[in-house]
Amino acid sequence: MTKSVYEFWISQGKDKLRLPVLPDQLSISNTVQNETVKVAKFGDLTFIDEQGAKEISFSSFFPKKYSPIAEYQNFPSPENAITKIEKWMKAKKPVQFLITGTKVNLTCSIEGFSYSEGQQDIGDRSFDIQLKEYKTASPRKIKQKKKTKAKRPSKAAPKTYTVKKGDTLWDIAGRFYGNSTQWRKIWNANKTAMIKRSKRNIRQPGHWIFPGQKLKIPQ
């Protein structure tokens, strides 16, 4: 009998089991966990989620003796094969399910395993097995942005104005502020220098300014 190009392997670490007899049928289901939400005026809205885990199921048997239906010789006894699978289940660790010649190579959990007296020969063990793709949740790393201290706006340096012949603080204020009544801002910013220049500014604040004199114009 011509042997199949496919080999079914189940392993956990270095402990491996190759199925002696290939199943007649292999079922692999793949679902998407979509969520449907009812929204007023819009009806049903479906949000497509990530692809769900694959589920694999098949049936076969562990032969007691070699026959042409077996894929290879010197396979483990039905008792040893069953013990191996049950040991993997008790370990609560995933197994690797591989089918050579295909793209099937999945890390799985054993969801169900049952066996019974075989229907071929005495000593054979028929079995059903259900596997589910095992996915680990990897936490996403979120980079936390460092808070930067807001820079306080620096005070703008006051402008300077060189007094011309005929200027008054009243006129200068009207020119820079559009409001001549703001002349006291210029006076307060230059009071010390103006009094130093002419003591008459004590009695008549801001009245005495001179051509060539530099005045600070505050913002």
From Swiss-Prot:
Gene3D superfamilies to which the protein is assigned, alphabetical: LysM domain
CDD domains recorded: LysM (cd00118)
Domain of life: Bacteria
A Pfam family that the UniProt record links to this protein: Dit_like
Residues of the LysM domain: 159-217
Region annotated Disordered, chain positions: 138-158
Compositionally skewed regions (Basic residues) per UniProt: 138-154
PANTHER family (alphabetical): PHAGE-LIKE ELEMENT PBSX PROTEIN XKDP, POTASSIUM BINDING PROTEIN KBP
Name of the protein this chain belongs to: Phage-like element PBSX protein XkdP
Organism: Bacillus subtilis (strain 168)
